[in-house]
Each structure stands twice: as structure tokens, then as C-alpha cells.
């Protein structure tokens, strides 16, 4: 299983104060020196709430690890990434809403302009991945447009797992739709969410598409996904950075790597 470390929220700390620290390149090399991280993931959002264009340029210039850039189909961002001298190892196209706290679901593959953006990256020799819900129609779209990799949105699975097996439902930011569900209901929905991820990962494998997954994964809910043999990569960020605030980035990375690289 490949471990993709999302370092967006290292930069969130910097941008909150509009200062120079924490240094994104220091985070990069801490990750590299653990010898446990396979790639670095960043999300270049339209609103630039964390990662900036300059961060992209600096990372691509010196990173010893592959860089996966998440982004929307925004024309300005597409043009910027297609113009880069140093190319990312892949671009993962994600849905984006300026009012969202974080990505809320998978990509709508009927989105106007999506096909043109995929073609633009392919024409520049940049691998494309699509951040999708685990649905067969989305996989068929990927195959039809020569997309060799997808990342399944694991938010539904992760939220259900957290509601059932942690104290998430008692916290200030508890998800209201899950608070009133019984443990039996949560278990059934969690089981179904896991089965759907497993089915679609297997479907992707038979289509010749590499299946990755990410969103909301943490030190508790990630373990079950290791039972899906056709999943090849997990992208995890917020949970690792949250733990890093308390124990340090190196230790937080190593603890996660110990879980997913058995």
C-alpha cells in the first residue's frame, strides 16, 4: 500500500498568520527522511486558502518524492499546472466549492469542461486521477477518457466509522445526520460503505484502473481498508498533521505508516 501524505494543513498554520512558518519544505524532507512516505499530496484550491502557486513551484523544483496535486477544473489553475517546467507526478481532479470546509464528495463526471481538462493534462504528459465516489458509472467515465487512476472518496465510510467507534458524536463538530442514528443503523451503513469501496476497487482492478482512496482517514478507521487488496494507495493528511501538533511530524508519520505498511 502506498502512503500519500497530504501536507495542506502544514501550510494552513502558516497562512492563518500570513507568516513564513511552518516551512513546507521542512515538512517535505521530514516526510522523505522517514522512508515511509511514497508521495506528497497538496490541494491547490481556487481560493488559495492554504497551498499557494509559489509552494507548488518550490515543491516541484526540489522534491525527492512524487508530487500529487489536487485541483478543480478551474481554467486559471489548469493553465498554470500545464505551463509548469517541472511536472507533478499526477494531477487529481476534485470537486470544489468555495464555501466548503473540506471536499464534500466525489467528482460529478458530467461536469461541463471536465473532458477538456483531462485532455489538456494528457497533452502535457501529466497523469490524471479523478477523485470520485465509489460508483460504477464514474469508473466507466474514467476508462472511456483514458484515466488510469482514481481516488475513491472515503468520507462516508470515515464519518460512519468515527461516529460508531470514537467520541466524534459527542464533540462540538459532530455530524448532525449521524447523531440520532442507533449503533445498529451505523454498523449497517458502515458495512455497506465498506462493501461498496471493496466492490468498486475490485471493479477498477478489472478495468485496468489503479484504485486509491482518501478523505477523512485517521489512525482508527484506516485499518479496515487494508482488507481491500485492490486498493493501492491511501492519501491522508489532516489526521497526521493533527497528531503532529502533539507528538511531532516524524512520529505522527511513522505511526500512520506502521498501520498501513504492514
From Swiss-Prot:
Compartment list: Cytoplasm
List of residues binding 1-deoxy-D-xylulose 5-phosphate: 8-9, 45, 50, 102
UniProt keywords, alphabetically: Cytoplasm, Pyridoxine biosynthesis, Transferase
Marked site: Transition state stabilizer: 151
GO cellular component: cytosol
Active site: residue positions: 43, 70, 215
GO molecular function per UniProt: pyridoxine 5'-phosphate synthase activity
Highest rank taxon of the organism: Bacteria
EC number assigned by the record: 2.6.99.2
Primary subcellular site in the record, as a coarse category: cytoplasm
Known pathway: Cofactor biosynthesis; pyridoxine 5'-phosphate biosynthesis; pyridoxine 5'-phosphate from D-erythrose 4-phosphate: step 5/5
Catalytic activity: 3-amino-2-oxopropyl phosphate + 1-deoxy-D-xylulose 5-phosphate = pyridoxine 5'-phosphate + phosphate + 2 H2O + H(+)
Binding site for 3-amino-2-oxopropyl phosphate: 6, 17, 216, 237-238
Record-linked SUPFAM superfamilies: Pyridoxine 5'-phosphate synthase
GO biological process: pyridoxine biosynthetic process
Class of the enzyme per the UniProt entry, highest EC level: transferase
HAMAP family: PdxJ (MF_00279)
Family note: Belongs to the PNP synthase family.
Role: Catalyzes the complicated ring closure reaction between the two acyclic compounds 1-deoxy-D-xylulose-5-phosphate (DXP) and 3-amino-2-oxopropyl phosphate (1-amino-acetone-3-phosphate or AAP) to form pyridoxine 5'-phosphate (PNP) and inorganic phosphate.
Known partners and oligomeric status: Homooctamer; tetramer of dimers.
Protein name: Pyridoxine 5'-phosphate synthase
Organism name: Helicobacter pylori (strain P12)
Name of the gene: pdxJ
Amino acid at each position: 500500500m502506498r502512503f500519500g501524505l497530504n501536507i495542506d494543513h502544514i501550510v494552513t498554520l502558516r497562512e492563518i498568520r500570513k507568516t513564513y512558518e511552518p516551512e513546507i519544505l521542512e515538512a517535505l524532507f521530514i516526510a522523505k527522511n522517514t522512508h515511509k512516505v511514497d508521495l506528497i499530496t497538496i490541494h491547490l484550491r481556487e481560493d488559495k486558502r492554504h497551498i499557494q502557486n509559489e509552494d507548488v513551484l518550490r515543491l516541484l523544483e526540489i522534491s525527492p518524492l512524487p508530487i500529487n496535486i489536487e485541483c478543480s477544473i478551474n481554467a486559471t489553475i489548469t493553465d498554470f499546472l500545464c505551463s509548469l517546467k517541472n511536472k507533478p507526478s499526477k494531477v487529481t481532479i476534485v470537486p470544489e466549492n468555495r464555501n466548503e470546509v473540506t471536499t464534500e464528495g466525489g467528482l460529478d463526471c458530467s461536469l461541463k469542461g471536465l473532458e477538456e481538462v483531462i485532455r489538456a493534462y494528457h497533452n502535457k504528459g501529466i497523469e490524471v486521477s479523478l477523485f470520485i465516489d465509489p460508483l460504477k458509472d464514474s469508473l466507466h467515465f474514467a476508462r472511456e477518457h483514458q484515466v488510469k487512476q482514481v481516488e475513491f472518496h472515503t468520507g462516508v465510510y470515515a464519518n460512519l466509522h468515527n461516529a460508531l467507534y470514537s467520541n466524534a458524536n459527542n464533540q462540538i463538530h459532530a455530524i448532525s445526520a449521524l447523531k440520532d442514528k442507533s449503533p445498529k443503523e451505523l454498523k449497517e451503513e458502515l458495512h455497506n460503505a465498506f462493501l461498496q469501496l471493496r466492490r468498486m476497487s475490485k471493479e477498477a482492478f478489472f478495468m485496468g484502473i489503479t484504485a486509491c482512496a482518501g478523505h477523512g482517514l485517521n489512525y482508527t478507521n484506516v485499518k479496515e481498508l487494508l482488507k481491500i487488496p485492490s486498493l493501492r494507495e491511501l492519501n491522508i493528511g489532516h489526521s497526521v498533521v493533527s497528531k503532529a501538533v502533539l507528538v511531532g511530524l516524524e512520529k505522527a508519520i511513522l505511526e500512520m505508516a506502521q498501520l498501513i505498511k504492514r
